[in-house]
Design a protein with these regions (language model features):
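C-terminal accessory module of base-excision DNA glycosylases/AP lyases that mediates lesion recognition
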Residues: 1-44, 64, 134-220
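Short, solvent-exposed loop/turn segments at secondary-structure junctions
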Residues: 71, 127, 210
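Catalytic Zn2+-binding segment of zinc metalloproteases
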Residues: 126-133
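Helix-hairpin-helix/helix-loop-helix acidic hairpins
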Residues: 55-114
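A positional/architectural concept
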Residues: 39-59, 68
């Protein structure tokens, strides 16, 4: 794993930055270390939804908020709204929650949400269980592909997206093992620590990878 030096991960987490036009309209500043205000809010609510076990009320507005938080060049909100009448959204969310501890089954279920390609399907998993899941977005995908650490993912094939996410999840687990073996502690911030010696969750590793990928973009 020579392309990534985990000793840099604390600095990468501190360098994480995400902001779009929806932050201000929703009353949030940009998501930056150490507060990550919108991320922390989405994460807290997502964990509570998943912890219920049985979904009795469909969190449609919560999904809309995830789409608003992540809105970039490929904003899927119109596809989401247009597809709502064609699926039982509450049944899909129940399936996600039922399988949240099984990465392959969880991402397969999340991909059934209208407009939720791999980026947003994995974001939902990340907010439902940040200890176990991270978001695999286009920036991270491109950087890992260039570093030959993740295969090409074909978004037109569900099987490719599912396999790609499972590979990414395994990579994050290996990175956490390296962080643990080197006793590299996660910097203290507004988000909870994992119940481990170093405190890194997969979502934290993903955020560090996002900043790592941004650095790779600047260097290319």
């Amino acid at each position: 794993m020579q392309a990534i030096d985990v000793a840099e991960f604390p600095a990468f987490l501190r360098a994480y930055r995400w902001i779009n036009v929806n932050h201000a309209s929703r009353g949030y500043p940009g998501d930056t270390f150490p507060d990550f205000p919108w991320i922390r809010s989405l994460e807290g609510r997502g964990v509570r939804i998943a912890a219920k076990g049985v979904i009795t009320a469909c969190p449609t507005d919560y999904l809309r908020e995830i789409l608003a938080w992540g809105a970039g060049t490929n904003d899927p909100r119109m596809k989401f709204e247009a597809g709502l009448g064609n699926v039982s959204l509450i049944a899909i969310i129940q399936q996600v929650v039922d399988n949240i501890h099984q990465p392959r089954a969880a991402i397969e279920a999340s991909l059934q949400i209208p407009g939720f390609g791999l980026t947003y399907a994995s974001k939902l998993l990340r907010f439902f269980d940040p200890t176990l899941h991270g978001s695999l977005d286009g920036r991270i995908r491109a950087a890992l592909l260039k570093a030959e650490m993740l295969p090409k993912i074909h978004d037109s094939y569900a099987s490719s997206m599912i396999d790609g996410y499972v590979r990414f999840h395994s990579l994050c687990e290996r990175l956490i093992s390296e962080l643990e073996s080197q006793s590299i502690a996660r910097p203290e911030c507004s988000m909870p620590f994992a119940e481990s010696a170093t405190g890194w969750r997969i979502a934290d590793v993903e955020m560090a990878l996002f900043a790592w990928a941004a650095k790779k973009d600047l260097q290319s």
